[in-house]
């Protein structure tokens, strides 16, 4: 086992050959590299599988010994300046490595089929492998220098992946927005690192924590400056994990391919911020104001993300705001000092959200066969409905992920979220109230997504389907607002062209579908308008590769929660996760008893589960009945009658809808105050530079030209006149200096 630790430095290096070889191959042997493109997918999966086995071996060693291994190499620049580079293996590293590799492998297998039609197939796998290598380097870093380097590499890879389809203006704008927003947090992180180095003289985590702790306890440092450094450090995770107020990039990141969304929102990029806060928790604990700020930002993000998800019509944007809210739960747990609960929820949420995003990718693929390759239609839940009849396997997998994320026992997220909710009562009743209420909102918006997608008729061809219907309850079921762009009467169905039989595009399916490179070369079929009685075809189930990945991911929400369930009633830390994290930081349960009371285990979740079921029933009542025969019941018509109270209720609902659909107007505020303000300042600066600075320079030149021409005219081009003028000017200058200095 000691050899496993000694060779842990290769973990971030194993996936690196893929992007390097693909780049060299495309540069020197483009034809051969493209013809062997599926070989690169296989190599990517194989290398990441090696890292996964390595990580599992490290985790087993951590459970048996609970040891921490650190290896350092010193790079001496001068006699006074040197840096230490190495790797750091502890339980947190083991957990993150397993998350990155397991989710990464499944996403790569999924992408082999999902991206088979795309001309950027090789570029996609090169980006993905480099992204995984950067994340693995981040979690194994032993000091601030290394972690900042890999932090920036992760940001660069996310920029490339979000803007993968960079020819689309929306995708190009989304990757720029993500990049700029994260630059704000990264600048704060850099300033915080430099400030702590100035205080402690070290970049190493363990040395820095010990030195800073002694300085604070001995009152040898300015506490205000230390708090400022901690706040600046926290700015990095706030941006990377999409916490308020730097959360605005996350929904726009959905413009990338769906496998990217699964990877970014599950176990990698957004989890990097949670990882860094967990890594620096010993530093934040000795600064009370820092812990308060972390918990405050967490609870705001929990509630804000849930409310913004209520009215989203794009299925991926709804899941993105769900991710934002769940990351807020993790940040809240870390701010409360509940280290174990935060990491537990990080694990359970990663697999559940990966399942949901990959399920949404399967749905989008199915819808593209009907509406064509138009993301604003294929991802629009308003145009879906009734898919449970056509994609039953996807529906089952999506339902499992939805139930897990809602916190329904005994699925995975129930155990982790309930632990966080119980800890909030010990920390703050106000925070607990908000957290429990948001748990109900989570159940509501997740089942809203599920019901709009899978239940009822297929809305794309529903007769007279639009927001123009005046039935108030019908409007509530769709959050009652039309798309800003009118729906055209005719659509063109993009024909899916099959590849040659000797070119298999997935590991399991014998054939795949390719989308033609240009619309003009595509055969198309005109679909009847919405008023038609039937359409040409209905959505179909995805290929076997996509279904296989989803069925494997279904196992994780079913069973991964077991790692946090106590196995022995006599010992409170008898579960696998506690053994792995022992000794761990848990400020809220330091005085807890050393045995498990199963009555308390059953009683404590009662409130949270009740709120969750209420949210599910509310979503079911608002969305499900209007697609059934209950729509014509007199009781519904009774509730739909207009009156003063009804009008007030509609105004409240419309306000909530507008507030949620428009992202709480935060993006608009940033656009007006920051983007347009900076552009206005830039235009003003440009105008000042052009009119004033350039005017002075050009004015001096023009004045010199005319003076020279005047002298030339007066002198008649005679050299003697020029010499005489020069002598008189020199004499005048000397007289002026004499009287000015010696008067």
Curated annotation (Swiss-Prot):
Give any Pfam family that matches.
Proton_antipo_M
Q: Which GO terms describe its cellular component?
A: chloroplast thylakoid membrane
Q: What does this protein do?
A: NDH shuttles electrons from NAD(P)H:plastoquinone, via FMN and iron-sulfur (Fe-S) centers, to quinones in the photosynthetic chain and possibly in a chloroplast respiratory chain. The immediate electron acceptor for the enzyme in this species is believed to be plastoquinone. Couples the redox reaction to proton translocation, and thus conserves the redox energy in a proton gradient.
Q: Which gene encodes it?
A: ndhF
User: Which biological processes are named by the entry's GO terms?
Assistant: ATP synthesis coupled electron transport
- Which keywords appear in this protein's UniProt record, sorted alphabetically? Chloroplast, Membrane, NAD, NADP, Plastid, Plastoquinone, Quinone, Thylakoid, Translocase, Transmembrane, Transmembrane helix, Transport
Catalytically driven reaction(s): a plastoquinone + NADH + (n+1) H(+)(in) = a plastoquinol + NAD(+) + n H(+)(out); a plastoquinone + NADPH + (n+1) H(+)(in) = a plastoquinol + NADP(+) + n H(+)(out)
Record keywords: Signal included? no
Record the organism. Answer: Citrus sinensis (Sweet orange)
Topological category with respect to the lipid bilayer:
Multi-pass membrane protein
Q: What InterPro entries would the database entry show? A: NADH_UbQ_OxRdtase_chlpt_su5_C, NADHpl_OxRdtase_5_subgr, ND/Mrp_TM, NU5C-like, Proton_antipo_N
What's the subunit arrangement here? NDH is composed of at least 16 different subunits, 5 of which are encoded in the nucleus.
Tell me the compartments it is located in: Plastid, Chloroplast thylakoid membrane
Establish whether keyword Cell cycle is in the entry.
no
Q: What is this protein called?
A: NAD(P)H-quinone oxidoreductase subunit 5, chloroplastic
- Membrane-crossing ranges are 9-29, 40-60, 89-109, 125-145, 147-167, 185-205, 219-239, 258-278, 280-300, 327-347, 354-374, 396-416, 425-445, 546-566, 607-627, 721-741
Q: What is its EC number?
A: 7.1.1.-
Q: Name one GO molecular function term.
A: NADH dehydrogenase (ubiquinone) activity
Q: Which family does it belong to?
A: Belongs to the complex I subunit 5 family.
């Amino acid at each position: 086992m000691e050899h496993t630790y000694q060779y842990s430095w290769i973990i971030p290096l194993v996936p690196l050959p893929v992007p390097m070889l693909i780049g060299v191959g495309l540069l020197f042997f483009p034809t051969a590299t493209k013809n062997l493109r599926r070989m690169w997918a296989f190599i990517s999966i194989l290398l990441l599988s090696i890292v996964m086995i390595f990580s599992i071996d490290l985790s087993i060693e951590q459970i048996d010994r609970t040891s921490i291994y650190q290896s350092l190499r010193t790079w001496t620049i001068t006699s006074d300046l040197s840096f230490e580079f190495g790797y750091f293996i502890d339980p947190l590293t083991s957990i993150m490595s397993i998350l990155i590799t397991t989710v990464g492998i499944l996403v790569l297998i999924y992408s082999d089929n999902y991206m088979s039609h795309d001309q950027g197939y090789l570029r996609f796998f090169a980006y993905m492998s480099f992204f995984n290598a950067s994340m693995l380097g981040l979690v194994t870093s032993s000091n601030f220098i290394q972690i900042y380097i890999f932090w920036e590499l992760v940001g660069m890879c996310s920029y490339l992946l979000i803007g993968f389809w960079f020819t689309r203006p929306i995708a190009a704008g989304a990757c720029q927005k993500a990049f700029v927003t994260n630059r704000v947090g990264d600048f704060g992180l850099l300033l915080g690192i430099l400030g702590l180095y100035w205080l402690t003289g070290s970049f190493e985590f363990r040395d820095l924590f010990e030195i800073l702790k002694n300085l604070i306890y001995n009152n040898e440092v300015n506490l205000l400056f230390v708090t400022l450094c901690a706040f600046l450090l926290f700015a990095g995770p706030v941006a990377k994990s999409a916490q308020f107020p730097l959360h605005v990039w996350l929904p726009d990141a959905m413009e990338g391919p769906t496998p990217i969304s699964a990877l970014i929102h599950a176990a990698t990029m957004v989890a990097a911020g949670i990882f860094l806060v967990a890594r620096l928790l010993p530093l934040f604990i000795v600064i009370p104001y820092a812990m308060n700020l972390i918990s405050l930002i967490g609870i705001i993000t929990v509630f804000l993300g849930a409310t913004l998800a209520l009215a989203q019509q794009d299925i991926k944007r709804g899941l993105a705001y769900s991710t934002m809210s769940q990351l807020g739960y993790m940040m809240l747990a870390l701010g409360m000092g509940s280290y174990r609960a935060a990491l537990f929820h990080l694990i359970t949420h990663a697999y559940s959200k990966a399942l949901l995003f990959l399920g949404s990718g399967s749905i989008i693929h199915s819808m593209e066969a009907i509406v064509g390759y138009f993301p604003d239609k294929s991802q629009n839940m308003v145009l879906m409905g009734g898919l449970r009849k056509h994609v039953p396997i996807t529906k089952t997998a999506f339902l499992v992920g939805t139930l897990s994320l809602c916190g329904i026992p005994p699925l995975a997220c129930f155990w982790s979220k309930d632990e966080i909710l119980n800890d909030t009562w010990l920390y703050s009743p106000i925070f607990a109230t908000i957290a429990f209420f948001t748990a109900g909102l989570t159940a509501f918006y997740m089942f809203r997504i599920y019901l709009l997608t899978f239940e009822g008729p297929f809305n794309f061809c529903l007769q007279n389907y639009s927001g123009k219907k005046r039935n108030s309850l019908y409007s509530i079921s769709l959050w009652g607002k039309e798309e800003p762009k009118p729906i055209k009467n005719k659509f063109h169905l993009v024909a899916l062209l099959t590849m040659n039989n000797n070119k298999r595009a997935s590991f399991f399916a014998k054939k795949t579908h390719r989308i033609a490179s240009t619309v003009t070369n595509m055969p198309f079929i005109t679909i009847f308008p919405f008023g038609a009685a039937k359409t040409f075809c209905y959505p179909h189930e995805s290929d076997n590769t996509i279904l296989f990945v989803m069925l494997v991911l279904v196992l994780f929400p079913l069973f991964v929660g077991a790692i946090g369930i106590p196995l022995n009633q006599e010992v409170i830390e008898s579960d696998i996760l506690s053994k792995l994290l022992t000794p761990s930081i848990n400020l809220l349960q330091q005085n807890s008893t050393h045995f498990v009371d199963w009555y308390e285990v059953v009683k404590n979740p009662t409130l949270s589960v009740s709120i969750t079921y209420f949210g599910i029933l509310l979503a079911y009542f608002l969305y499900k009945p209007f697609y059934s025969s209950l729509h014509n019941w007199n009781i519904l018509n009774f509730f739909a009658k207009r009156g003063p109270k009804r009008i007030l209720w509609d105004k409240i609902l419309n306000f909530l809808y507008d507030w949620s659909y428009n992202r709480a107007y935060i993006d608009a505020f940033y656009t007006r105050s920051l983007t347009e303000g900076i552009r206005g300042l830039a235009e003003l600066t440009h105008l000042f530079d052009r009119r004033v600075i350039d005017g002075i320079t050009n004015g001096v030149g023009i004045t010199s030209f005319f003076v020279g021409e005047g002298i030339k005219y007066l002198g008649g081009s005679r050299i003697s006149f020029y010499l005489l003028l020069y002598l008189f000017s020199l004499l005048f200058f000397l007289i002026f200096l004499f009287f000015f200095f010696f008067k």
